[in-house]
Amino acid sequence: MADPAQLTVTPSRHEKSLGLLTSKFVSLLQEAEDGVLDLKAAADTLAVRQKRRIYDITNVLEGIGLIEKKSKNSIQWKGVGPGCNTREIADKLIDLKAELADLEQREQELDQQRVWVQQSIKNVTDDVQNTGLAYLNHEDICRCFRGDTLLAIRAPSGTCLEVPVPENTNGQKKFQIHLKSTTGPIEVLLVNKDTSSSAPVVVPVPPPEDLIQAPPAVPSTPQRPALTPQNDIATSPAPTVPHSTISNAESQDCPTGQTFSMENTTSSRLPSIDTCPLQSSASLDNSNDSPDPSTSFQPIKSDLSDVLELPKDMISDFFDQTKECITSDLLEELMSSEVFAPLLRLSPPPGDHDYVYNLDESEGVCDLFDVPINL
């Protein structure tokens, strides 16, 4: 009888099969951290003498897309983890494919609806009867906002718009809009002007020469024009003599309706000069008062070359007194007069030193534009 110790234990054919080794290898791979497994460690764990069998398993699994090689002796699992039901994953995949097909069908329906809408819009715009209804004109906008003031504002890009909290004065709220632009001018237009009223008169400040020298309107009955501060500028004559004495009234501030009076001392030394009368701006107003007989209108010179021959001290004295008359109060009355009534001033009120810049006798163009001169 043979010794039991001498008997060799031979494994069965099932234990040596490649299928059983593959199942053990896949289980070991699924349990590895992050699905990464070292082939040398797997061969030692599975007690595989021939590593060729491990390589055969990895080649098959890589071919069907369940694993991928990370390095020469390292692989990573790409399939489902342990405990996952393959049947549930297959059912979920079928549901996702059905949902995707439904979404594609809805997308086709939306594309068809868009084509129909575009064709309908084209049919409406191409119809001749609908041509006049494709836009809004001035009257359509004004009818929608009856009793309100509409202003069209066109400002460059980057304009700052501020609307302060409205102030409640006597039960009425006063709204203000502040616009500020550093890149270009801001244009403001009045939209809802009544078509039955007269056209607005837009006059710059100060008025141009053609408006001042326009022929006066002859009233049917004697009327007295309302004298406004504008008469102070229009009725101030240019000096007609090289040397004159100014009355005491001129040395004071110019009241309303007052004109300059000069005494001629050397009129015999000047030749005869063509003159033209200066029309008062009061004749432009449609007031019912008769002209004031105390208001005098002096002629002005039509030839500027004769004026330039006058002494510089006399011309400077005249313009100095003219600047004293043009104050901020005078400009305020100009803006509030009937001639400037249609204007809506959006800029700050004028001051006393807006247009009084000049050059001394020793200054030149370089001083005007601040151009440095290197000597």
From Swiss-Prot:
One of its GO terms (molecular function) is DNA-binding transcription factor activity, RNA polymerase II-specific. Residues 39-61 are annotated as: Leucine-zipper. InterPro entries: E2F, E2F-DP_heterodim, E2F_CC-MB, E2F_WHTH_DNA-bd_dom, WH-like_DNA-bd_sf, WH_DNA-bd_sf. Residues 12-81 bind DNA. SUPFAM superfamilies: E2F-DP heterodimerization region (SSF144074), Winged helix' DNA-binding domain (SSF46785). Belongs to the E2F/DP family. Component of the drtf1/e2f transcription factor complex. Component of the EDM complex, at least composed of e2f4, e2f5, mcidas and tfdp1. Keywords: Activator, Cilium biogenesis/degradation, DNA-binding, Nucleus, Transcription, Transcription regulation. Residues 197-300 are annotated as: Disordered. A motif (DEF box) lies at residues 44-81. This is Transcription factor E2F4. It is found in: Nucleus. GO terms for biological process: centriole assembly; motile cilium assembly; multi-ciliated epithelial cell differentiation; positive regulation of transcription by RNA polymerase II; regulation of transcription by RNA polymerase II. Transcription activator that binds DNA cooperatively with DP proteins through the E2 recognition site, 5'-TTTC[CG]CGC-3' found in the promoter region of a number of genes. Component of the EDM complex, a complex specifically required for multiciliate cell differentiation: the EDM complex binds and activate genes required for centriole biogenesis. Activates genes required for centriole assembly (plk4, cep152) and genes specifically required for motile cilia formation (foxj1). It comes from the Eukaryota. It comes from Xenopus laevis (African clawed frog). Residues 82-177 are annotated as: Dimerization. Residues 220-270 have a biased composition (Polar residues). Residues 280-296 have a biased composition (Low complexity). Residues 299-375 are annotated as: Transactivation. One of its GO terms (cellular component) is RNA polymerase II transcription regulator complex.
